[in-house]
Amino acid sequence: MEQPSPVTRQSFDEWIVPTYAPADFIVVRGEGSTLWDQQGKSYIDFAGGIAVNALGHGHPAVRAALIEQADKVWHLGNGYTNEPVLRLAKQLIDATFAEKVFFCNSGAEANEAALKLARKYALDNFANKAGQQGEKNQIVAFRNAFHGRTLFTVSAGGQPKYSQDFAPLPGGIHHGIFNDLASAEQLITDQTCAVIVEPIQGEGGVLPADKEFLHGLRALCDRHNALLIFDEIQTGVGRTGELYAYMHYGVSPDVLTSAKALGGGFPIGAMLTTTKYASALSVGSHGTTFGGNPLACAVAGTVLSLINQPTLLAGVKARHQWFIDELAEINARHNVFAEIRGRGLLIGCVLNAQYAGKSKEIVQAAAQYGLIALIAGPDVVRFAPSLIISPKEIKEGLARLAMGIEQVCQKVTS
C-alpha cells in the first residue's frame, strides 16, 4: 500500500477553508486521556474534542463495536431500517422521558429538527383554530446561547458574532436574558411555538441555568402551549453526572437534542420527543441521508451502555470535586479566577478583571506544557474531559495548566 504523503500544520493553511485556526501541532494518536503529536510530544486531554470523547480515546469496547459493525453493513439509507438504530432508539427511550427518536449527524441538525418540529406542531394544532390570535410560529431563545451553525440554528443562538454576516436571517426568533424569568415572560406569548434553552450555556461561558428559571420556563410553555426544547448537545450523555442535565432539575422538556458525546467521537445526533409531538412529522416531512447510520448507531449504543451506569455517573460527580479542589489550590497561588462553575465534567474557570480577555492565551501557554483545554469566550477557560479520566491524569493535567498560568501571570505582572 502506498505511503501517505507527509503533511504539516502549514498544509492546513494551504488546503483547508479557513473557518478554524487549529493549534500549531498535529495530533496523530490518542489513548485514554493522553494524546501524542507528530513529534511524539504527549498532551493530557481536558478538551475531549469539545465534550465529545466521553470515554477518552481508543476505548476498547467502543473500538470493538465499530469493527464488529464494519464487518456487517455500513450504510443503507432511509428506505431500510437496521438493527443498531432500533436498539439505540430503545435505549434512549428507556433512559429518558422520550417515546420517539429522530437520528441525524450533529447537534446543529438535531436542533434544526427540533425547531422545525415545533413550528409544524403549532401549524397543525393551533393555526386558524378558534381562540388562537394570529400565527403561532415565534421562537424564544436566549442571549449568548449556541445551538449550531445552520442558518436557522445560528439565528437561534444569541451570539451576533456568529450570525451577523449571513443576513437576511430567518425571522420569528426572539432572545431573552438567560436566567431572567421576567425577561422570558415578556417574550413568551400565545404566538410562541417553542422555547429553546441550554441547561448549561456551554459556548456562552459554562453558565448553569437556575432551577427556578427552568421550572418557570416549563410553566410558561404550558400556559402558552409552546414546546420546551432542551439543547443538551454539550450537557448530555453523562457530562454533568446525570445521563442528561434535565434530570438534575426535576423538569422534563418536550423535546431534547443530543449529539457530541452520544457517539463518543463518531458523528451522530438525535432529537428525542414524545409520541404526541412526533406525530406532527410525517413521511417525507423531514430527513437526512446518514441519519440512523448503522456504524454510528452501533458505536453510540455501546457508548450509552457504558455511560448510563450508576458507578460511572457517580464517578463524574467525584471527578468534578477533584477538579474544583485542585483548581482552588492553583487559584490560591496565582489569583486568576473570579469564579469556578459548571456541573460534573463541564467546568468553566472565569478569569478575574486583571486577566480579562486572556483565556486563549492561558490555553495556548498550557499547550506548551502539554495540556489541551478549551475556552468559552475571552474570559473563561473550559474543561470537558473524558468522563473516566484518571485521578493521575487530572493531577498531571492541572499541574501543566498551572505552569501555563504562571507563564501568563509573569507577563501580566512584569
UniProtKB/Swiss-Prot annotation:
- The top EC class is transferase
Read off the Gene3D superfamilies from this record. Answer: Aspartate Aminotransferase, domain 1, Type I PLP-dependent aspartate aminotransferase-like (Major domain)
Output the InterPro entries linked to this UniProt entry: Ac/SucOrn_transaminase_bac, AcOrn/SuccOrn_fam, Aminotrans_3, Aminotrans_3_PPA_site, Class-III_PLP-dep_AT, PyrdxlP-dep_Trfase, PyrdxlP-dep_Trfase_major, PyrdxlP-dep_Trfase_small
Q: What does this protein do?
A: Catalyzes the transamination of N(2)-succinylornithine and alpha-ketoglutarate into N(2)-succinylglutamate semialdehyde and glutamate. Can also act as an acetylornithine aminotransferase.
Q: Does the keyword Transferase apply?
A: yes
Q: Per the UniProt record, which EC number(s) apply here?
A: 2.6.1.81
KW Chaperone (keyword) present:
no
Q: Per UniProt, what is the name of the gene that codes for the protein in this document?
A: astC
Per its record, the protein catalyses: N(2)-succinyl-L-ornithine + 2-oxoglutarate = N-succinyl-L-glutamate 5-semialdehyde + L-glutamate
Q: Which residues carry this modification: N6-(pyridoxal phosphate)lysine?
A: 260
Cofactor(s) of this protein: pyridoxal 5'-phosphate
Q: Which family is annotated?
A: Belongs to the class-III pyridoxal-phosphate-dependent aminotransferase family. AstC subfamily.
Positions of transmembrane segments: none
Q: Could you tell me which Pfam families the record lists for this protein?
A: Aminotran_3
This protein's superkingdom?
Bacteria
Which PROSITE patterns does the entry mention?
AA_TRANSFER_CLASS_3
Instruction: From the UniProt record, give the pathway where this protein acts.
Output: Amino-acid degradation; L-arginine degradation via AST pathway; L-glutamate and succinate from L-arginine: step 3/5
Query: Which terms does the UniProt entry file under GO BP?
Result: alpha-amino acid biosynthetic process; arginine catabolic process to glutamate; arginine catabolic process to succinate; ornithine catabolic process
Give the protein name, as stated in the record: Succinylornithine transaminase
List the keywords (alphabetical): Aminotransferase, Arginine metabolism, Pyridoxal phosphate, Transferase
NCBIfam families for this protein = arg_catab_astC, argD, PRK01278.1, PRK05093.1, PRK12381.1
Molecular function terms, GO-annotated: identical protein binding; pyridoxal phosphate binding; succinylornithine transaminase activity
